[in-house]
Amino acid sequence: DQIFVLGGAKNKRLSEIVQLASKAEIAILEVSREKLDERTKGAHQGVVALLSSSEVINKNQMTEQQLFAYLDDNETQLILILDGITDPHNLGACMRTADAAGVNMIIVPKDKSVSLNPTVRKVASGAAETVKMVSVTNLARCLEGLKQNGFWIVGTAEKAEKSVYEQDLTGAIALV
């Protein structure tokens, strides 16, 4: 594993990254903006991590088949189900907000939804690495499976009488 940092850049955020990488004994290389641009097609904010294993990138993604086995073995309490999110910025923002709200997992349909891509990861600001994401073929069948696994399915709407913050969301809950 290596971290490439923009040479000559002096800001608190990059300094903290360099300190953490040093403590973790990760190689740190100062490089030019052109080298960073080359590695990222221009989207880097002055730092790039090169990981030796795709397992790190994919550890929070799972298939539909793995979903219910995972639920049997883990205490996932709050799931967010998103349908029709096609803009990667919107999915990234949803992931970031979900992470802050304590959501353990996000479920999206495979079709007509954006997948987890570099733009989503960037906008999610780390949430893509902490919130599990599952792409399913059939949302209705998935909801039925969640019910059979003891989840309460809670529908949300923009014009609901009560805010989501006024609801009792303890226990196994899936927000749609």
Task: Give, region by region, the residue ranges found by the protein language model.
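Post-transcriptional modification and biogenesis factors for structured RNAs
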Residues: 1-175
